């Protein structure tokens, strides 16, 4: 769900949608080799990491970077220990890790990827600078949640559902 929220947000902006296409979500635990073969030619691959997918995402990100050292590996979610000073010594294959909310940061990353690839002015990131950490400060919070379209209402999941008619899909509403 979280990656779909990120894409729902950035897909509102024409400068993003005319340059980028959303690939298929990593939602099953396919064999790492199969996932790497499918993703290694992408320019950017992002991981939204939680307790239930941390190990898999970590291995997949590491193997993707081995297969294509030029791929930009993004990470986010509550399961990366971003407070650790040696984060990129533990995860040298991750290029950028988003702290807290990632919607605005993700949009800026996509914009900078097309131009100067200098992400240091984007708030809310940890950037891997050859194993050293550049911390760009706190993320810009979203004041109005209505600025993020629901991925359930924007057809983001439609192609995934059409590709897998054998699966009975359901949606979950989660609140605080």
Where are these regions (language model features)?
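Radical SAM [4Fe-4S] cluster-binding motif and immediate context
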Residues: 146-147, 151-176
